[in-house]
Every structure is written in structure tokens, then in C-alpha cells.
């Protein structure tokens, strides 16, 4: 009788349209219930039975029910699932398999089966890649996943590497392929094999892509020739090797090993500027005046060189600082080191006065055993030899940026626009509360940005600097020349690492077109998008492997009284994140560890401070002593507590 009744259908429609709904993201808790977070201010309770229909991180539309002044959300429609492709650990065996996603807030096992054609018999503890196939909000009875790739067995010592690479869908090994002979590029190569070029790298480096030669000129000027490995002499544009490098975009450097962008035969041998081996290079000759200014007579050219020495950072630094036993093997090499140190000094001063110089942070190096166990983590400060190479590379990249801009009008540029214009007024207001007066318009210019950075660098602590970081825009990769505010430069284009960066290979091809007087094509946007995405994934992979190794390394320190100096890097409502000074590990200090009475404690991300009873007790950039309270291996998280 009521079937197809238009009035009833209309009433249903009215009820549906009048029922309040909200769209948001599901946040799970460890207690079974959850919340629908609509925005920073508003969230709705999701009862445990309703949580069975959703997963942490799902974006959904929910019906909002009000009972006795309490609102709750009933999930109705899936907008975007949190899980699509994921990695996890297999439980059960044969025909009754489940997989637990490797994610701190996803604890539930999801029923699954191996995809057709996947020839692996999964067993308890195996790691796998899976893809979600069913979701309750899509009309399915339950969640269901399909195992699409076997990663490795549970006890594999190298789980951190293989699982991380699979998670981010990154290559596990070097690309296939060989380059048998050099291309005929129609370039005349200058023979510089008699000059005393040197490379300065870590002792273990095999892919040496830069060699340096310096010479004193009259009028207190110095000449620097930067010679860079020449993979585009072997790899033709559009070839199989070129396409593989374009996809990888960068060599992926992970703790313990790297996955190269080019076949190892090229990266570690044919292109590597090994000592006493003749190699083709792309080179830049520049003249530096007494104050470190790069003069206008910049010259790019093709050449052949023969590096006369593979020098090691620490040994060179020791020698220049008059310590250690090492000394250069000849007076000619010693003279090169002295001249390069002079160039470094001049360029450092020039950048300090006319651009910006980054504060030195140490690099942290994991020392691993044969089974991937962490034997030690050492902080490697950036010393004089590191700075010699850095200043030479920055100078060479400034030269390339100018030449490409003036001769072609395009290239692969690193662009950083400083502060987001939308944040300029808020930035000026924040600085004013700390006694620094800046003009909101001026700070958006390169000069204004540099002026502010110098004022911040002169502050007694890095606190204010850390406060304004959130107002900065991100660095981008662009085919259009533009300023790099972070370096304080009008333009910056890298070409000094073509073995490990595809963008540098592109700039090599463009510079060669300039040398030959040929026209060139502007790089397509899809290339810069791919490079930016790969850079993001590689950084996440490095962080993920690092987190795993830090957890392994610090596990036996949990619950002991071992003290670590730690710098506060972030403060949120839930507590503080700190970085251990000696090894770089990130740890979390929950708010209850800071003060037992919650009402007397204010953790403010906005102000970067922790207040107890109205008094500021901690602030970002403070260095405090902590002990390790707990290491949770399943989430690779380190929990610390302040030393009372």
C-alpha cells in the first residue's frame, strides 16, 4: 500500500535533508571510541559500535544525533578512505590470514588473502604490501584487503629498509643497464689533465662528482675551476637509462646504504672522478676578487681532467687545523688545499655580508654491523673541509643560475620565496611583541628577508627564529628563474651533482647547449613535479628508517638512568618533542611527565612554551636533560622524561 507512495518518498527526503550532518576526519583512540574532527575547534563523539564501520583517518560524512544535550556521530558515507595501499604484518596462516597495518593508530587485524598470481605462501610475521578491497561504508559487510606484494620475513635484520622502501613504493636496487661508449656530442673538450685537481669527500664515498682546482692571480684575485662528472656524455636524452633516472629523480641516501639514480657502473666508476683516472667533465671557470665577489667573466666549458688526489674531509680539516698525522702527499696538493681554504674564507665572508649563511648543524651517521644492527650513532660536525666543498659548490651553482637565466631564460632552479605574503602582518605583529620592528611589505623582499635573518642570527637564542619558521613558504623546484630567500640569492640552479640528481643532469644538457650556441627546450612542468614528489618520498623514507634504527639503538636505555642532553624542537597540547643532541633521535615527552596537575599546566604550540602555574618553565630551543622512559618498537617511538 505504501510502495511507490510519492508522499512517503517526499517525507523521507525531507527527514533526510533536515537531519544534521557533518564532514570530517575520524580520529581513533585506544579505548574503542573515536571522534569525528570537523575542524580545529569542533569534533563529535563516535561510539564504539559505530567505530567498527570506519578506520582512523577516514574522511567521512556522518549523521549527527543529539540526545540529552550530548551529540554523537553516526558514519554514513565514505568521502576518502585513509587506507588504500599500505604495508603491514601478516597474522594466521594459509586460508585464514589477516594483516595489521604498520601504523601507530591502526591496531585491528584486517582479513585478507593473497592476490592471484602472487607466488608466496604467507605465514605469521611476514611483511606484505596490501590494498584495501572492501569497506563497510561502501556497502560491504566488513573491511577486506588483498596482499599484492611479499616484502620479507619477520626476523629479517633488514626489515627497516625493505619495509620502508615498499611503503613509499621506492626502488630497492640500482637501475639495470650499461653505457658502453661516450656519445658524440659535438663538444670540444679542453685538456686539463695536467692540472692538480683534487676531490674532497667522505672516506667511503665512491660516487665522486666534483673536483676542484684553484690558482692565485695578480691583484689578489683567485681563480677557481669546478669540474663536475659528466653522465650526460654517456646517457642520451630519452634513452632507457635516462628514463629510469627521470623516474628516480635522485639517488636515495638511507642510513647504511644508498640506492643510486644511475647504474653503479656509471655512478661509482665511469663517471666518478677517481684519483689518477682520466674523466670527461663539465667545468666552470670563475674569478674571485679580493672580497670574494664572483666576477662577470664566468666560463662554462667541456674538458677532460685527471684528479690527482682523493682527499678525505676529516684529514683535510685536521691538517688545516694543525692536528692529526695526515699530510698532503705533495707540495702541489698542499698548495691546492691552502688556496681552496682561502677561497672558502672569501666566499664565506661574501655570503655573510651579501647573502645568508646557514647555521652549522652536525650530520648524524649510523654505524651499522653486518646484520643491520646499530653499533653507534655519531655526530659529524661540519668542519673546514666540508665548508670548502660547500662554498665551491654554491659559487658554481650561482654561476650556472646566472648563465642559464641570461642565455636561455630557463633551467632547473631551486626557488624559495621566503615568507608567505598572507602571513606578513601576523609575522610583523609577532616580532613586535619581541621588540623587533619590521615592515610587513619590506620583509617580503629579498633584502628585507636577509636583513631580518641577520637580526635573528644576532639574537642570544634561536627561540624567536623557531617561532617564525611556520610563516615561511617551502622551497620549490621551478623551470623559471627566481630568488632563493633561504640562501639570500637572486637565483640558484644546481648542476654539481648530476650522478645523484636528475635536475642537475638537465642543467648539464642546457649548459652544453649554451656552450655550443644551440637552442634548447624549456623543461616541462611534469619533470619538476616528479622531482619534488621524489624528494618528499626520499626524505620520508630516510626519516622512517632513521626512526626504526633510533628505536633499536635506544631500546636498552629505556628505564635506565642514562641521561641525554635534548633540545626542545616542538611543543603541542599533548607534550614536547625533543631532539637528543648527541645522536639526533627525536623523542616525545608526554604532558603528564612535565607536571602532575593538568589544570596547572599550559602547553602552547602558538607561543612555543610550557607554563606551570603561570610561570614559563620550558620553551622551544631550550636544552634539557632527559632519560628514556620507554621505547615502543611497534610504533618506533621513543618516550622520554625530563630529569627532575
From Swiss-Prot:
Gene3D superfamilies: 2.40.50.640, Nucleic acid-binding proteins. It comes from the Bacteria. Keywords: Cytoplasm, Exonuclease, Hydrolase, Nuclease, RNA-binding. Residues 561-643 form the S1 motif domain. It is found in: Cytoplasm. Belongs to the RNR ribonuclease family. RNase II subfamily. GO terms for molecular function: exoribonuclease II activity; RNA binding. It catalyses: Exonucleolytic cleavage in the 3'- to 5'-direction to yield nucleoside 5'-phosphates. InterPro entries: CSD, NA-bd_OB-fold, RNase_B_OB_dom, RNase_II, RNase_II/R, RNase_II/R_CS, RNase_II/RNase_R, RNR_Ribonuclease. One of its GO terms (biological process) is mRNA catabolic process. This is Exoribonuclease 2. One of its GO terms (cellular component) is cytosol. Involved in mRNA degradation. Hydrolyzes single-stranded polyribonucleotides processively in the 3' to 5' direction. The lineage of its organism: Bacteria, Pseudomonadati, Pseudomonadota, Gammaproteobacteria, Enterobacterales. Pfam families: OB_RNB, RNB, S1. Its EC number is 3.1.13.1. Residues 189-516 form the RNB domain.
